[in-house]
Amino acid sequence: MKVRYVITTLKQGVDATAYERWLREYDYKVAKTLPSIASYTTHRIEGPIHGAETAGWNYIERIEIRDMDQYQRDLASPAGQELLHQLYENYLERPRNVFFTTEAIAE
């Protein structure tokens, strides 16, 4: 199963408490309805990021994806588009996001 990580930065002036409330009340709930997502959590970054102390990142998302093609379709769906609209219109500084997809190395 692929895992996508998204490292994010709040827009200037956005209250972290408001963003985290939106995560719990909206984002997590919508993610659970998308067929491609097996699990999704966002983690608050605490302390410096060694090697990138000035990056300004605040959160890292971990998204377990069942099927990448379906994931792209889910993001393009009305629910996915509304989620992304709210996320980037109200909370996150999109140009400062870093994301990558991984796959576990089997034993």
Mark where each language-model region is.
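Macromolecular interaction modules
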Residues: 1-107
